[in-house]
């Protein structure tokens, strides 16, 4: 009795029957015909070795087949991946400045608003189909498996900050005025000597009496 891993001749089976579904498969060979020395495991000896065997699937179902050709194996694998990323950001900055004269009070209001939204959607679909058929009998085993996983992550972040700053500044104004007056006085003194000789004229009754004194030596009398 010989135990084989399976009929895995590359020329007829391609990838062979070593698939995830056939992990539990084993073939027990009951052929009494021995392999001659030097014959090896060629195509003819491989066919003769596989003519009489029993195949057990998963330990539950079994069937016997006398197959001149090995089994046909089909495998289909489907994988779908979807990824969606959404990012929304809003940033608002508001500034207000108030100025009051004289006292000069500065008020500055700063408002900062920030909204952040992050959405992450991850979808994964996995499909698996396995088909194995024998040509000499009607036996088809199909296994289909589909798995869908969807992950959605949404993150929202809102931040608002208001900063109010008041600065009071008082100004003291000192005005100093200096007036300089220059007074220049010019005094001009003019001294004028005026000698005026006045004659006294007296109108007397009908005559003028003039007395001229020329010398004391010649007195003259005028009447």
From Swiss-Prot:
Residues 117-148 are annotated as: Disordered. It comes from the Eukaryota. PANTHER family: OS08G0543275 PROTEIN, PTHR45134:SF23. This is Putative uncharacterized protein FLJ46204.
């Amino acid at each position: 009795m010989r135990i084989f891993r399976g009929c895995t001749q590359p020329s007829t089976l391609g990838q062979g029957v070593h698939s995830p579904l056939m992990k539990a498969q084993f073939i027990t060979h009951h052929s009494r015909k021995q392999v001659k020395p030097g014959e090896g495991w060629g195509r003819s000896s491989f066919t003769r070795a596989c003519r009489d065997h029993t195949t057990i699937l998963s330990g539950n179902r079994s069937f016997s087949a006398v197959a001149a050709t090995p089994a046909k194996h089909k495998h289909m694998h489907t994988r779908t991946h979807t990824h969606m990323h959404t990012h929304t950001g809003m940033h608002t900055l508001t500034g207000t400045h108030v100025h009051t004269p004289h006292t000069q009070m500065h008020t500055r209001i700063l408002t900062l608003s920030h909204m952040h939204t992050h959405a992450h959607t991850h979808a994964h679909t996995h499909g698996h189909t396995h088909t194995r058929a024998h040509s000499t009998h009607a036996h088809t085993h199909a296994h289909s498996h589909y798995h869908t996983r969807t992950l959605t992550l949404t993150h929202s972040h809102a931040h608002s900050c208001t900063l109010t700053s008041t600065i009071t500044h008082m100004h003291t104004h000192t005005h100093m005025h200096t007036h300089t007056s220059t007074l220049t006085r010019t005094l001009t003194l003019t001294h004028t000597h005026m000698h005026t000789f006045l004659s006294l004229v007296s109108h007397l009754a009908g005559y003028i009496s003039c007395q001229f004194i020329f010398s004391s030596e010649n007195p003259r009398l005028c009447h």
